[in-house]
From Swiss-Prot:
Signal peptide: none
Provenance organism: Yarrowia lipolytica (strain CLIB 122 / E 150)
Name of the protein this chain belongs to: Exocyst complex protein EXO70
Gene3D superfamilies: 1.10.357.60, 1.20.1310.30, 1.20.58.1150, Exocyst complex component Exo70 (1.20.1280.170)
One GO term describing the cellular component: exocyst
Cell compartments where the protein resides: Bud; Bud neck
Organism placement in taxonomy: Eukaryota, Fungi, Dikarya, Ascomycota, Saccharomycotina
Chief subcellular location: other
Gene coding for it: EXO70
Keywords: Exocytosis, Protein transport, Transport
Functional note: Involved in the secretory pathway as part of the exocyst complex which tethers secretory vesicles to the sites of exocytosis. Also plays a role in the assembly of the exocyst.
Cited PANTHER family: EXOCYST COMPLEX COMPONENT 7 (PTHR12542:SF41), EXOCYST COMPLEX PROTEIN EXO70 (PTHR12542)
Any one GO molecular-function label of the UniProt entry: phosphatidylinositol-4,5-bisphosphate binding
Family: Belongs to the EXO70 family.
Amino acid sequence: MSLRPDEVDVRILEENLLKTNTLVESMVASCQKISNSSYKAEITIEPISGMQRRMQVYETNLNNCLKVVDGIRDYAKVTAREEKIIRQGPEAVGLPAYVAAIQSVIRVNDEIEQRKLHSIPKVKEKAVDLARMGTSGLKENLATILKEESNPIDPVPILASGKPFPLMSPKNADKLNELMGIVARFSARQDNTYVDSRSRYLAMSLSPVASKVKPTVRTGKAPYDKQSNGIHIYAEALLKMLQAEHDNLRCAFPKDEARVKQYFTQLAQTPLQTYQAAGEEISNHVQRNISTDALLIFELIEGTVALKRGLEPLTNSAAPLDRLIQSSYNVSQGVFTEILKICEARVQQVMTLPSDNGVCDATVEVMSRIRRFAEYKDSAVLAISGMKYQQWIPQPRPAWMSTFSSAPAGYTTTKPQELLSAVFSDSIDAFYVTLEMKAKQLNPKKPSQVGFFLLTNLTLIERFVTKSEVYKVLGGQGRERLEKLRKRGLNLFLEGWKATASLLMDTTVVNSKGSLSSKDRELVKDKFKTFNADFEELVKNHKTYTITDPALKQLLAKEVAFICPLYHRYYDKHIGGDFSKNVDKYIKYDKAQFDRVLQELGD
């Protein structure tokens, strides 16, 4: 039976598939055999591979251990080597080698920490100890240099000589600069060796000066003598020493302005606080003893202000001085008032006037105080700058001011110089007017003598003014106020002369025939008699005055000469003799004689 072509192809394909299946089965069986063989090989080989890996780990660990051992051996060698150097000290081995040794042991410690080699604590401890020992050695070396430069000094002879205060040697300054920089690198905290050493130097040098400013209560009522306390020396010594310290810092740290500023602030703090405490003690003392030690407060202000101004270019940390200056200003305001009270009170102690109507002791004492006061004019100007005009006038208003004041009516000012001038003028007013009131009380019926007494004392007052700093303090306006006092004294002195001169004010009338009435004749006679008696009494009294000052003598003679033209006129009117047949009995002086008598008063 014959097959179609398609069937033949199918049959061939089936046969081929059958062969393929048989081949695949054979391959699967072979792969299974290979797999079984591989499994057996793996089981056999795996122990060998694991052992190899463990051997590699062992090898690595062993190498690491050997490296550690080598490292430990190296660290121990380093610390042993550097220990010899560090123990010798920087002076023996030199600073570079010494610093290198410290850096080396610090590096050992750092590496041990970084590698976490906790199994070698002794090596680490040794490195730490050596680093600490090395740093201490540097500080000791630093302290040695500072000690060499910090022997206490006595500032007083240096101030007296005008020489500059001692500075560190440039060589040691360079060493300090280097050492301080190294110590700063090796120290976690700021090292205070420099500040501590120089602070002790300042304290020990200034201590003897500071001990001499302690105020003491003095016996008696004598006023304070300038510079007898010593605060001015203390202030000047402190300034000069701090300026020298700043120069030292600039020399030691020429490129480190921040450190200069920091160290100087620290160095200045304690000395300034100590000075402030001494100043506050003086200020309190003045308040308790203001009648005798009032001027000491201006000496304190003067020294403290100079100290502050001297330190301003170096530091802005002078708060203790600011506080002291302000408290001193507050005390000084009471001193201005006290000066006026002293001037008035001293006059109240006067019981009698001098027999020659001359200068009284009170004038000398008061003007001596005012002269001393003027010596502190600069500090007084500073202190008064915060006051109002005449705030210093005692309350209640004193009697002298209600009687007379030489101050211009309605005057006021806020300028410190003018305020101080007003204080001095008011002080002189207080004394002069109170002296006038006292003189009138003791000698009520003789105004001319009172006037002469006042003018004599004013002459001494002016002498004190012109020969002292008072002249500068008063200025032009103060001198104008003195002139008002002079005019007041002259008016008193001339009262008797003016009363006598009033007799020459003729009220008589000459009739058309050139003659006087009988009543007027008698009046002229009485006037001449009275005038002659009064005039001679005035001249007699004038000649009894002890006038040692030529200028005053000439001034008084000039002032009384106002009567000359009045006498001349009266003389010319009546010399014809109409009022009397015996003219010489009433007219004792012709015009030339009269003028000569007055001229002799000025010779």
